[in-house]
């Protein structure tokens, strides 16, 4: 099999990676998310805020932590992917927990 050369591009955006991580780790912190994905904590907080503001996740306080729930019934944001629901993507990239941590 031919080796794929190293480069900086990825198939999934940081937003998709954060959403996938939250699906699998609903009590995660922004710091834990950032470390797992390889982004800064500030970037993780920004992405979590954007996902929350757009309705893709909801946050609920439990003690000193947030617990996240994912809304799988919203469409992808890309114009060419509006017929694909976020839950469909999560079923592929986070299959083990996708069904348990959804609204």
PLM segments and residue spans:
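Alpha-helical residues within the helix-turn-helix
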Residues: 32-35, 52-53
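Key DNA-contact positions within bacterial/archaeal DNA-binding proteins
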Residues: 42
């Amino acid at each position: 099999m031919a080796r794929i050369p190293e480069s900086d591009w990825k198939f999934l955006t940081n937003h998709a990676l954060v959403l996938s991580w939250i699906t699998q780790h609903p009590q995660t912190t922004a710091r834990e998310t950032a470390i797992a994905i390889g982004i800064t904590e500030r970037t993780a907080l920004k992405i979590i805020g954007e996902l929350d503001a757009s309705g893709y996740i909801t946050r609920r306080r439990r003690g000193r932590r947030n617990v996240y729930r994912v809304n799988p019934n919203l469409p992808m944001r890309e114009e060419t992917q509006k017929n694909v629901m976020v839950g469909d993507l999560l079923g592929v990239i986070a299959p083990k927990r996708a069904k348990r941590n959804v609204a």
